[in-house]
């Protein structure tokens, strides 16, 4: 389930490190988190949608790898994004 353009723009505006930033780890993690939340809501009503469940697991793995990278490169940015997104790690 792709994100709407308006949702993407609001996420980019909130988590961008500079003007026009679309690829920083913070923005990528925030986008993945929103998609994960949307898919989680979808799976609450469609429990037997195994294709979407697999997609959810892939997204969680991508986010985990990005967070691992952030923790290795700059622990303060990692802690900041974890707190801002409200995800436990």
Curated annotation (Swiss-Prot):
Keyword Ribonucleoprotein recorded: yes
SUPFAM superfamilies reported for this sequence: S15/NS1 RNA-binding domain
Molecular functions (GO terms): rRNA binding; structural constituent of ribosome
UniProt cross-references to SMART domains, sorted A to Z: Ribosomal_S15
Keyword Cell membrane in record: no
Entry keywords, A to Z: Ribonucleoprotein, Ribosomal protein, RNA-binding, rRNA-binding
Domain of life: Bacteria
GO biological process: translation
This protein's GO CC annotations: cytosolic small ribosomal subunit
InterPro entries registered for this protein in UniProt: Ribosomal_uS15, Ribosomal_uS15_bac-type, uS15_NS1_RNA-bd_sf
Oligomer and partners: Part of the 30S ribosomal subunit. Forms a bridge to the 50S subunit in the 70S ribosome, contacting the 23S rRNA.
Membership in a protein family: Belongs to the universal ribosomal protein uS15 family.
HAMAP family assigned to the protein according to its UniProt record, in alphabetical order: Ribosomal_uS15_B
Role noted for this protein: One of the primary rRNA binding proteins, it binds directly to 16S rRNA where it helps nucleate assembly of the platform of the 30S subunit by binding and bridging several RNA helices of the 16S rRNA.
Protein name in UniProt: Small ribosomal subunit protein uS15
Organism: Kineococcus radiotolerans (strain ATCC BAA-149 / DSM 14245 / SRS30216)
Lineage: Bacteria, Bacillati, Actinomycetota, Actinomycetes, Kineosporiales
């Amino acid at each position: 389930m792709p994100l709407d353009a308006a949702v993407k723009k609001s996420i980019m505006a909130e988590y961008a490190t500079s003007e026009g930033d679309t690829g920083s780890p913070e923005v990528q993690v925030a986008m993945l988190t929103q998609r994960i939340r949307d898919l989680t809501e979808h799976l609450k009503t469609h429990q037997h949608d195994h294709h979407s469940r697999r997609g959810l697991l892939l997204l969680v793995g991508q986010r985990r790898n990005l967070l691992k990278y952030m923790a290795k490169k700059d622990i303060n940015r990692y802690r900041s994004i974890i707190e801002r997104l409200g995800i436990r790690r």
